[in-house]
């Protein structure tokens, strides 16, 4: 039977100093011997998804204490991708994932914590904490801050007024539309983000919080209960109770089934990806799941994702893939248990797998899917939680309820497999000479008439250069915009291309152009936007050899992406490039890169493996220097 890790610092004569310090933090004599639960909070006033988490961690801590554990809270950093977008700050977003993982590892191991609650929410925080949880492999529960309410705006059109829902992406697109007045833009800006919480569409943050629920490390409702709703308080209380129970099962009963590596198995990764494909989640989720699989030592790669995308249909289209639905609507339709229920009934997920709350996937669906004949009353109650319609930066600030649930599986927010939006899933992996190791596209956000596309390349050496080109009308209808040297090493940091895609839409080019990059996309991106092209330009990928005017052909049904240039010409270009530049680097790009970012680039791997860190790259260099 494993001993409590915390005994290292709470027991033995020689640990008197450690106990003295713990006493100074409020730990009493009778607490020594109880499981110490690290509460990894990510509260910050910079990020709307995290601005309310100070109070949230207190609720978790109180629940841990009531269940017989000793809570110890600490903080991690949290980068807001939306604020960091469109300037040099975006270079730091993806690298922050590794910093967060390291910070959690450092704190938990330095203080010998027995279990972990991850209070996360936004884009890189949940993935960073997931990497740490898999690395540490101690009893862990994830509980996020919850999604933001969708914005609502009154649009004046002559004498008529209509109210429509919107989110962060709307003012971004409008800012590039010359037909939108400053007054209209200001109205959109003020209405887009009305409350605390992760941005209201199926963007990266909400996608990842839904996936932690599907993979089995979070509680029912984690991905969809609104940040402002009182119903979310029960989630935090339950997280505190469950983590102490999991710690007891492991340390007192030697039950390894509660450990992250026992839950996040290859089959669990497949379940999570099936959900992702079904709901048309952010392409960033592919990056993070691949990195998590690498951390867990799980054999799960792009080929597995490609196979799932061909087998699992798209059951849910939420902003930015649809103007009609946001996360609050997914919640009204039953949230993640409802989507998992539809997949389970079609035999598309493994229902035998364990989850941290003690149920199998099948039991979770049976109890929490509102379409199940055995649904629990508390599940029905939970999914009635609705937006409050008032500006708020506080957790638990409203308790509005829907008057009815969305049970329409034919044309509602969540559809059955029989009535799916498309028989293929909402994400796809493309391969070809332009991306032999793979590239990814969110098909749920692409109109089907664009699933095959061919056009001349318009090449840019950076995101900034591309933005200038789009706004200055250098990009024309039919072009394939190529943005390169923005990969994990080439950026470094693999910037998101939300501004280029938003500005293409703002200029009316969103449905007549394609965009390909070795960088990545925000979860708010839609349109024919293909990212993660691997190998990246900085690693010698053929994307470095594309020239203006080259024809690029995209064929989503056949999962191909082809640079229509003969191989001998590509080889000649490669030789010329190496002779001219001495390596694969952008021409005439002026970009300050700090030592911290250079350190990240030195250890970053390809997007095809999740841009996971590989320390051996540095170790090999050191050994051979």
Curated annotation (Swiss-Prot):
GO terms for cellular component: cytosol. The active site is at residue 522. Mg(2+) binds at residues 81, 123-124, 496. The keyword Metal-binding applies. It catalyses: (2R)-2,3-dihydroxy-3-methylbutanoate = 3-methyl-2-oxobutanoate + H2O; (2R,3R)-2,3-dihydroxy-3-methylpentanoate = (S)-3-methyl-2-oxopentanoate + H2O. [2Fe-2S] cluster binds at residues 122, 199. Gene3D superfamilies: IlvD/EDD C-terminal domain-like. GO terms for molecular function: 2 iron, 2 sulfur cluster binding; dihydroxy-acid dehydratase activity; magnesium ion binding. Its EC number is 4.2.1.9. Its cofactor is [2Fe-2S] cluster; Mg(2+). InterPro entries: Dihydro-acid_dehy_C (IPR042096), DihydroxyA_deHydtase (IPR004404), DiOHA_6PGluconate_deHydtase_CS (IPR020558), ILV_EDD_C (IPR056740), ILV_EDD_N (IPR000581), IlvD/EDD_N (IPR037237). PANTHER family: D-XYLONATE DEHYDRATASE (PTHR43661), D-XYLONATE DEHYDRATASE YAGF-RELATED (PTHR43661:SF3). Functions in the biosynthesis of branched-chain amino acids. Catalyzes the dehydration of (2R,3R)-2,3-dihydroxy-3-methylpentanoate (2,3-dihydroxy-3-methylvalerate) into 2-oxo-3-methylpentanoate (2-oxo-3-methylvalerate) and of (2R)-2,3-dihydroxy-3-methylbutanoate (2,3-dihydroxyisovalerate) into 2-oxo-3-methylbutanoate (2-oxoisovalerate), the penultimate precursor to L-isoleucine and L-valine, respectively. This is Dihydroxy-acid dehydratase. It comes from Thermobifida fusca (strain YX). The gene is ilvD.
